[in-house]
Amino acid sequence: MRSSWIKPRLGKDNVTQINFARNGYITEEMDFVAKKENLPASLIMEEVARGRLIIPANINHLNLEPMSIGIASRCKVNANIGASPNASDINEEVEKLKLAVKYGADTVMDLSTGGVNLDEVRKAIIHESPVPIGTVPVYQALESVHGSIDRLTEDDFLHIIEKHCQQGVDYQTIHAGLLIEHLPKVKGRITGIVSRGGGILAQWMLHHFKQNPLYTRFDDICEIFKKYDCTFSLGDSLRPGCLHDASDDAQLAELKTLGELTRRAWEHNVQVMVEGPGHVPMDQIEFNVRKQMEECSEAPFYVLGPLVTDISPGYDHISSAIGAAMAGWYGTSMLCYVTPKEHLGLPNAEDVREGLIAYKIAAHAADIARHRAGARDRDDELSHARYNFDWNKQFELSLDPERAKQYHDETLPEEIFKKAEFCSMCGPKHCPMNSKISDESLDQLKDKLEECNSSV
């Protein structure tokens, strides 16, 4: 679909959506997104130009169906997949991708760290993906030197970053906000640094006693990104890994640097979103969202969770979906899903499904709370189907039709019960909705009550 769109842009110094928008040009991607979001294309262009909305769309990802992330559009959900040294293979990761797309992932991140050829798994995922693909290049940078921090050079980081761009990665998590002077602020935390990318860079800085190379070479990375229209996802290396560490000096010091880097990326006309926590008590979520908007000049916010309790291993998708719904309500643009395996192991296909559905609920709830146009239409349609006992319509409109039908059919499997005016909870005699009170009866009752009141 995008080949004809991209061809005229080839060879230009800057092919980013924000560059076109700032020059008053509505790209095919902007027009496509406008139709998906039911918004004017002119508004999409204005929001992209302002930096409040991004369209992650690498020019080498030709089978991509463009989408947007930003406060003007629907709240989006990202799903993480990826192989590890201990589990998974390329075919399994491609199947996870397909499952994630099936259940509504708006973007997918390949977080592979080993166990497979990282280039091959990434190519396979991009080739199969209609949604934007994100990566964390420092993982492969470390893998390329067989885990030896002392052998990892600044140029190694940039080489891997450009390789990901060439392969069609739409956005990359760049942990450029972690500075060497931030590291002492981690003292006193319970869980220290929980970001894998942040941990790698912290070790690099401590070993070489030098500033973060992703910070010192940030302008070079911008020059790479604008050739491919790769989007920055500025990583939060010091995100809190537990409630105790939330909103501390370390996190907020890095956030200030992320704001500086956001504006530097915009100076190069490169798209950017900013990543956020993590583990945050419910009463601090609004503060975290507002603080990011203030420090980062309203660049789209992309949060992991946040989890609102630390005692839910095995159920962290529930704990975090609570925080995610609140974050979305307060203005977060994209929610990174958490699966039931979070903190416990590598998620399988079923974990991907469970995590995604939990987060689609959270994002949808946020859109309803923010009064986005049409956000509640599907809910109202399902409610009408429920009141009319249209079981098949209820299944069809649900976020997970297969699960809804499975649960209904566990107790009433025969096809005749798809027309029944009850389920197994109340049975035929006690369901309040199958004894429908007509509007006419209610009007008559209202008239009688008014007569009684007027005669008193």
Curated annotation (Swiss-Prot):
GO terms for cellular component: cytosol. Its EC number is 4.1.99.17. It catalyses: 5-amino-1-(5-phospho-beta-D-ribosyl)imidazole + S-adenosyl-L-methionine = 4-amino-2-methyl-5-(phosphooxymethyl)pyrimidine + CO + 5'-deoxyadenosine + formate + L-methionine + 3 H(+). Its cofactor is [4Fe-4S] cluster. Zn(2+) binds at H279, H343. Pathway: Cofactor biosynthesis; thiamine diphosphate biosynthesis. Substrate binds at N80, M109, Y139, H175, S195, R196, G197, D236, S237, L238, R239, E275, Y302. Keywords: 4Fe-4S, Iron, Iron-sulfur, Lyase, Metal-binding, S-adenosyl-L-methionine, Thiamine biosynthesis, Zinc. GO terms for molecular function: 4 iron, 4 sulfur cluster binding; carbon-carbon lyase activity; zinc ion binding. Signal peptide: none annotated. GO terms for biological process: thiamine biosynthetic process; thiamine diphosphate biosynthetic process. Binds 1 [4Fe-4S] cluster per subunit. The cluster is coordinated with 3 cysteines and an exchangeable S-adenosyl-L-methionine. [4Fe-4S] cluster binds at C423, C426, C431. It is an enzyme of class 4 (lyase). Belongs to the ThiC family. Catalyzes the synthesis of the hydroxymethylpyrimidine phosphate (HMP-P) moiety of thiamine from aminoimidazole ribotide (AIR) in a radical S-adenosyl-L-methionine (SAM)-dependent reaction. PANTHER family: PHOSPHOMETHYLPYRIMIDINE SYNTHASE, CHLOROPLASTIC (PTHR30557:SF1), THIAMINE BIOSYNTHESIS PROTEIN THIC (PTHR30557). This is Phosphomethylpyrimidine synthase. It comes from Prochlorococcus marinus (strain MIT 9312). The lineage of its organism: Bacteria, Bacillati, Cyanobacteriota, Cyanophyceae, Synechococcales. The gene is thiC.
